[in-house]
Amino acid sequence: MPTVHVIGLGRSGIAAARLLKRQGWQVEVSDRRQTPALQSQQQLLQAEGIPVQLNYDFDLQTLISVGLRVPDEIVISPGVPWHSPALVAARQAGIPVRGEVAIAWQTLAHLPWVCITGTNGKTTTTALTAAIFQAAGYNAPACGNIGNSICEVALTARALDWVIAEISSYQLESSPPLQPEFALWTTLTPDHLERHGTLDAYVATKAHLMNGAKHVILNGDDPYLRQHMVNRWPQAWWISTQGAIALPKGIAQGIYIAEDQVWFQDQPLLPTHILQMPGRHNQQNFLLAVATAHLAGIPAETIAKGVAGFAGVPHRLERIRQWREVEWINDSKATNYDAAEIGLRSVTGPVILIAGGQAKKGDDRPWLNLIQEKAAWVLLIGEAAPQFAQRLEAIGFTNYEIMETLDRAVAAAAELVTQYPIKTVLFSPGCASFDQYQNFEERGDHFRQLCLEL
């Protein structure tokens, strides 16, 4: 029986382990962490015949030196860097290393896939696309880097019609060449450079997905994609929220907004007022989803039904409540400066902004300029708080406080809204969550809980 070692006991690693076990592999799992939650998962998997090691860093040389069996294959979760020394050594030793998306693709390649990637906008576009396909009667779950992993979907007994998958750069770097029916690219700004090293490497990872797709759909409003990708895939479809004239020059295949209508190849398709979510960025997500559905043969009236019933996704400009006549908004999904800028631009000022976490590389200047324009106060949390305080001081913004934790920040915001004419309290961190939380969802859930307790 072939053996496989799965590294990472997150949702994707657990699902990959179970799927491989079902397919006849002898599976073992490891994770470098040890927490009560992981110990519970360890007990569940071991009851299913899958041994789990916690507080363990996989190392090939250690296995060899103590005479333990070397696995025939290694499968990694998205959080495990592709270029880590242990994985480099494994590949040099001839051991195949794959990501969990590769396991899912191997299982579900007979189905049509819609794959969505990009720096920002992936989650909303994925969820909206799935909502439209489901309105058409398809079993088409949203999965991947959103909610259920793709391997979790592969484990379900119910027959699938489509796979609607959000795929991150972390997942793509460990994936084989995929051949989806549709590949969508939402936006491109520098992100995850601490993982990929350079912008070129980050772009190449994203482009990897487009190369095998039957239909490529690109965001023509995104400056980087317009400048660098126009001739990359000659048969690609482009979208724009700013009319046909705003499509890249020489593009024959376009879907755009003009006169409050979505136009497809100069033919009106459906009105824009059916979209409930605010902001131009959400119009871009809307066009990408509509273009996909239309090209897949879904009628316009069904697309409109799916869009009209879609209110947005948790943690992305999610309205929690109105308290003291102030809107409290959860934007925990804003894990970089560009997403945080979009979030701040989308709400009504004056704003109390709660920001911070684990800082990323990137250009924070547009975000800081908007803070000067719209924020009455900034409350800083997490590892990045001292760094952000210095950046705010550098632009002459002094209405900030270092709060360290989200509990303290929400309590301070609740006090400030009684003293100033605030319209919105916005939690839009501009940072990763891993300094204080397992993921952005846990962070956003905590913010929601704190708001509802006011």
UniProtKB/Swiss-Prot annotation:
Per its record, the protein catalyses: UDP-N-acetyl-alpha-D-muramoyl-L-alanine + D-glutamate + ATP = UDP-N-acetyl-alpha-D-muramoyl-L-alanyl-D-glutamate + ADP + phosphate + H(+)
Q: What does this protein do?
A: Cell wall formation. Catalyzes the addition of glutamate to the nucleotide precursor UDP-N-acetylmuramoyl-L-alanine (UMA).
Q: Which UniProt keywords apply?
A: ATP-binding, Cell cycle, Cell division, Cell shape, Cell wall biogenesis/degradation, Cytoplasm, Ligase, Nucleotide-binding, Peptidoglycan synthesis
Please give the biological process terms from Gene Ontology that the record holds: cell division; cell wall organization; peptidoglycan biosynthetic process; regulation of cell shape
Organism listed in the record: Thermosynechococcus vestitus (strain NIES-2133 / IAM M-273 / BP-1)
- Localization in the cell: Cytoplasm
- Pathway involvement of the protein, from the record: Cell wall biogenesis; peptidoglycan biosynthesis
Entries under Pfam families matching the protein: Mur_ligase_M, MurD-like_N
Q: Which Enzyme Commission numbers does its entry carry? A: 6.3.2.9
Q: Main subcellular localization, coarse class?
A: cytoplasm
Task: Give the family per the record.
Answer: Belongs to the MurCDEF family.
Q: Which cysteines are joined by disulfide bonds?
A: none
Q: Which GO molecular function terms does the record list? A: ATP binding; UDP-N-acetylmuramoylalanine-D-glutamate ligase activity
Q: Which GO terms describe its cellular component?
A: cytoplasm
Q: Which Gene3D superfamilies match?
A: Mur ligase, C-terminal domain, Mur-like, catalytic domain, NAD(P)-binding Rossmann-like Domain
Know the name of this protein? UDP-N-acetylmuramoylalanine--D-glutamate ligase
Query: Record-annotated residues binding ATP?
Result: G118, T119, N120, G121, K122, T123, T124
